[in-house]
Amino acid sequence: MSERKPPYLRSALDSIPPYRPGRKVVGPDGRSAKLSSNESPFGPLPSVRQAIADAAADLNRYPDPAAAELTAALARRFHVPEEHVALGAGSVGLLQQLLEATAEPGAEVVYAWRSFEAYPLLTGLAGATPIHVPLREETHDLEALAAAVTDRTRMVFVCNPNNPTGTAVRETELAEFLDTVPEHVLVVLDEAYREYVQDPRVPDGVQLYRDRPNVAVLRTFSKAYGLAALRVGFLIGHPQVVDAVRKTLVPFAVNHLAQAAAVASLAAEQELLERVAVTVKERERVRAALLADGWTVPETEANFVWLRLGEDTLDFAAACEQAGIAVRPFAGEGVRVSIGLPDDNDAFLTVARTYPKRN
């Protein structure tokens, strides 16, 4: 009997590592603080939970593939035409849709590094070539990013605020960068953490896109809105880009519960922003405590802080884990720590204070 041959699979997959999400740990005293995934520490508001419960009565029906109610609500909220709004299963889903619409073998996708770790994974899956541009002082080097654009570049990602460093580029420099990128190259402003931004110099991408047809903005309901489990994000861009993104959406990918919860969240936005203010206050408290204790922590406009630890990264993460605190290590580089509830933040600060080294 001849040896069975395995099914043919794309060779491009051989070099792509699996995405590793933040995990949960439990300490010896039973503490389990998950500060590894940049999730909101707050559950959905009562009105949002009620909307989910009401929508559950129709789970035997397919969701609206056009998500018309949510699309209209987003258009009203951001003062854009409905044909400028596209939806996806979280901003990661939209990133994949964008790559399917623009990338092909031989094409290049440019982004800062380190940045959102899904960028190289999704770029590789699309068969395109990822181009990493090193950060400068933990933030985007926009001049180097512009210089990396070639005639093979199809898309540029700008994560603002940047994940995992939390740093943000300012309006003047970002606008200048956008105006240097060739018109045929799509620039995607990934603003997953926009709601946490307090610095007025950090631009709202929705304002920058309006007179730039090659700029699109990504947002998500997973972070500040607290709907990470439901996977719903949106893109705001010009019709040619939006039409392409809509075509690459897997049918019914944005489920019925997600649509209902997102609409209800927009209606309760003021209450949600009050929760954001609590997280921002905790963010500033945590960073100030770390700085006072001798740590180097870049300014952050997101819901996390970044500690560049180099070769001590995994050791520090292990010390946190032993205390029942999950953080997100990037081996050889640093640790990202999400802002949680005050008690969990205090537990993390205790580990940081007792750790024998500083960065």
UniProtKB/Swiss-Prot annotation:
Entry-linked SUPFAM superfamilies: PLP-dependent transferases
UniProt KW keywords: Aminotransferase, Pyridoxal phosphate, Transferase
Source organism, top-level taxon: Bacteria
GO process terms (BP): L-histidine biosynthetic process
Its EC number(s): 2.6.1.57
N6-(pyridoxal phosphate)lysine: residues carrying this PTM: K223
Summary of subunit composition and partner proteins: Homodimer.
Name assigned to this protein: Aromatic amino acid aminotransferase
Organism for this UniProt entry: Thermobifida fusca (strain YX)
